[in-house]
């Protein structure tokens, strides 16, 4: 997370809105995507804890498009605030979980300990590639 945030914060204001940073997305759209997925993981893990139901988030492109559409009117400050608030909420949620939820061999542990960090890492690398070529 810290590395992802550091790389994203290092992108100039001029480049933040440019399409093509991550596929067709701008860096701002990537920030919304990452924040929305922090929220989605809370939902997935909570549902599993409550019901034992293992959920997959569905077709990722559909969910991504829905997330971006819902947040399309956020300005720069609101986008950064949404990213930080979502991560703070995610971390508060995770810190309140019992230890057994973090076993990487478990369903919840895979989401929390593998999927989320890899998500941050992957998009950090996307942004690094974008800034190197633009």
Regions found by a protein language model. Name each.
Residues 1-12, 38-42, 46, 84-98, ...:
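Structural signal for well-ordered, non-membrane alpha-helices
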Residues 15, 68, 74-76, 108-112:
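Residue-level detector of alpha-helix boundaries and kinks
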Residues 63-101:
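Acidic/histidine-rich alpha-helical segments that form the ligand environment
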Residues 17-62, 99-134:
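Short, contiguous alpha-helical
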Residues 1, 76-83, 113-116, 120:
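Hydrophobic packing residues in well-ordered alpha-helices of helical domains and bundles
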